[in-house]
């Protein structure tokens, strides 16, 4: 699952992307148009790793939507 969000207002022009692959979640974010955006990789371990990764991704998506980001 890969989702892309943007937040734009008078002073901000940001993006945020989440990529869920099995037990790993990759978050990429920064100003729209920059060459090297920041990236965080979170790996989950254990029997429920895939489910934990899904819950984490859903939580982060809710957080960004609450802050005003729009899914593109």
Language model segments and positions:
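Short aromatic-glycine-(Arg/Gly/Cys) micro-motifs in beta-strand/loop hairpins
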Residues: 20-43
């Amino acid at each position: 699952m890969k989702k892309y969000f943007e937040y734009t207002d008078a002073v901000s022009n940001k993006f945020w992307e989440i990529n869920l692959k099995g037990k790993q979640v990759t978050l990429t974010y920064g100003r729209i148009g920059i060459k090297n955006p920041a990236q965080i990789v979170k790996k989950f371990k254990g029997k429920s790793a895939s489910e934990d990764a899904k819950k984490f991704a859903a939580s982060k998506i809710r957080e960004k939507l609450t802050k005003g980001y729009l899914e593109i």
